[in-house]
Amino acid sequence: WNIVFLDGDWYYIDPTWGDASYQREEGEETPTLTETVNYDYFCVTTQEIERTHSMDDNQLLPVCSAVQDQYYRHEGLYLQSADKEKIDEIFARAAQKGAPMVCFQCADDTVYQEVYRLLIEEQGIFAYLPESETTAAYLDSDRERTFYFWFTEVS
């Protein structure tokens, strides 16, 4: 991973953990490019990176504590609460852009669990499906408190 100085603050970026762009389909010799990029490790704090990465004790590194350029916050994809209006806004912006995927991060475990209950357990995600015949798939990470949703038209 890397440490970068951005807009006057230090951040961690791990592009290798976020690169889901190359996948091999069975029988393919070359990887294919997908449209999914994982932003969980883009401009994160020391506290966030230490949940999944181990640092060498012999390296003197700056403390990364700024959050304003963390991907989800910077892009308005960060939920401070399980606010239905904010969730509606995130899905509406993605639909307006024609994005095949919606992703966002929750501020803490309580918000993550409440959003999980609303969208997954209570099946609230289906309210965001387009009117055409569409299926939804999702990936969530309780460790990173993130959700990724994909919508695919049924052929």
Question: Where do the PLM segments sit?
Answer:
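Hydrophobic/aromatic-rich core segments of domains that either
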Residues: 1-43
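N-terminal accessory/pre-domain segments preceding catalytic cores
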Residues: 40-155
